[in-house]
Curated annotation (Swiss-Prot):
Belongs to the dihydroorotate dehydrogenase family. Type 2 subfamily. This is Dihydroorotate dehydrogenase (quinone). Catalyzes the conversion of dihydroorotate to orotate with quinone as electron acceptor. Monomer. GO terms for biological process: 'de novo' pyrimidine nucleobase biosynthetic process; 'de novo' UMP biosynthetic process. The lineage of its organism: Bacteria, Pseudomonadati, Campylobacterota, Epsilonproteobacteria, Campylobacterales. It is an enzyme of class 1 (oxidoreductase). It is found in: Cell membrane. Substrate binds at residues 71, 116-120, 178, 183, 243-244.
Length: 351
């Protein structure tokens, strides 16, 4: 496998420069259905035991790529070819924005973690929608992650989310409202019952597609449960837990700005998800993300109540064979415990 050599080269570069080089290649690959088929024949994996219908969407497997990798929905076709069961594009904002100053993406190699302070850099919802439609329809469900523009005052946040959702109504299979990025000033302050209630009441009037809320891992558990309950009562179909953490004690040499993801987040994200699932399993679709890098951890989250999973940092550290490795081993774990499908295993620890 060539990835160790490729990784060595990429990791010799600035983290964002390396990401941009990879994205350029993936955008080129996305233009060719033949090359995407070739990639899928090498790194894809299909097994009916992993298929599941959730909220009317057919997922070939539960493993998705989290938002932030493909910010402008420009390389979805190539990413699907690597075996993901679904993708989440974005974060898109209503207006284009450049994000925070560089450097703003860092590696913590010993901890197999990343720290990003990107700040929702994207081309804006109009160009994002145009990019999405270039190769639509897609072979797997695609979510659209929506954020607030940095210059928008808190008092006008609801209008801004309404505007970005309106621009994206004709793309994607579900929408995720991102109130939990630590890289937009005061964004996390919107994680409160009143705003979340207004947000989802507004959104459900605009679309019948599934709506998700992505939450931070740094909330007090009681506060998190109250916010999630408010979202569900107002019309949220699912909860994605968790976003990156601002707990800098989790790595040896943290940077001043940015949220941490990867293996350093595994324990914290798992603990938050466990409390979430105890309260809301069977009441909402639960998606677990944060520090998942192998089949064992993926399986644990599924048994804890996750219908779907997302990865990001592990894809950077482990390369294009990661999905295939996780999915193959996940099937073995399901078989070992006597489950006929992944659907049977969801929430097994809660029964």
């Amino acid at each position: 496998m060539l990835y160790p050599l490729v990784k060595k080269y990429l990791f010799s570069l600035d983290a964002e420069d390396a990401h941009e080089k990879v994205c350029k290649i993936l955008r080129t690959l996305s233009k060719s259905s033949f090359l995407c088929s070739l990639i899928h024949s090498q790194w894809g994996y299909k097994n009916p035991k992993l298929e599941n219908e959730i909220l009317g969407l057919n997922f070939p497997n539960p493993l998705g790529l989290a938002a932030g990798f493909d910010k402008n929905a420009s390389m979805l076709r190539a990413l699907i070819a690597f075996g993901f069961g679904y993708l989440e594009a974005g974060t898109l904002t209503n207006e284009a924005q450049v994000g925070n100053e560089r450097p703003r993406l860092f590696r913590h190699i010993e901890e197999e973690s990343l720290q990003n302070a990107m700040g929702f850099n994207n081309y804006g919802a109009v160009l994002g929608a145009r990019s999405f439609n270039r190769f639509a329809p897609y072979k797997t469900p695609i979510g659209i992650n929506l954020g607030k523009n940095k210059h928008i005052e808190q008092a006008h946040a609801l209008e801004d989310y309404k505007a970005v959702l309106n621009q994206c109504l004709n793309i994607g299979d579900y929408y995720t409202f991102n109130l939990s990025s630590p890289n937009t000033p005061n964004l996390r302050d919107l994680q409160n019952k009143a705003f979340v209630n207004e947000l989802f009441c507004m959104a459900k009037e605009m679309t019948h597609k599934p709506l998700f809320l992505k939450i931070a891992p740094d909330l007090e558990i009681d506060d998190m449960l109250e916010i999630v309950n408010s979202a569900i009562e107002a019309g949220a179909h699912g909860i994605i837990a968790t976003n990156t953490t601002i707990d800098k004690s989790l790595v040896f040499a943290p940077k001043e700005m940015g949220g941490l993801s990867g293996k350093c987040l595994t324990k914290k994200s798992r603990e938050v998800f466990k409390e979430l699932a105890k309260a809301f399993f069977n009441k909402s679709v639960l998606v677990s993300v944060g520090g998942i890098s192998d089949a064992k951890e993926a399986y644990e989250r599924i048994k804890m109540g996750a219908s779907l999973l997302q990865i990001y940092s592990a894809f950077i550290y482990n390369g294009p064979n990661l999905c295939q490795n996780i999915l193959k081993d996940l099937v073995k774990l399901l078989q070992k415990d006597g489950f006929l499908s992944v659907k049977e295993a969801i929430g097994a620890d809660l029964r």
